[in-house]
């Protein structure tokens, strides 16, 4: 997988097809490959996933962590953020290891990290320079999201206009989704790519990312650029970007001025 390209400790990825019955032989071969090896430790990183639980049971290992953050022992670790989808499996693993006599690691949970290389970051900088032609700091917008998570054009245009008034000393650019849709009617310079790592390297050279709850938001967080996630439907506490200055905003009780205040507070840190 391109996501784990620079992770030296990942050597084998078994990917089950989404449409099991259309690709039945590939699906069954995935399960056979899973069973062929014996593992020191098996971790289910998505506690609510039925296939995750099933594959954890199916795999050969003495030690299996099922990633359930709803049990009392995980909650008793007194980590108020244990419901976060990225932090939950880490807390669950720490809890499991403590049960088998291994001291719990109490360090801060690390950020998402796609591990961009220096070459990739340099390429991202070059792509940004081709778009803005100056040395100003850059605000990166992503105005799309799937389903009800997607804000209207009216909503985005109001925020965009407020940003252009407030941040005259910043570049404001927009990253486009694969669907090539802009909720601000292409008023800002746009960047389009289908290459996940190229997109991430581009974002890494901007100063702040603002976008709705989406895969692009998590990708921005993994680039280590300050990320502000906008939430109106999904649970902020479960999906918000975290670490450093990253923050999730519940927009159901905050207007455009409030969002600008949050952005200003983050940029001033």
Locate each region found by the language model:
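Catalytic machinery of carbohydrate-active enzymes
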Residues: 1-269
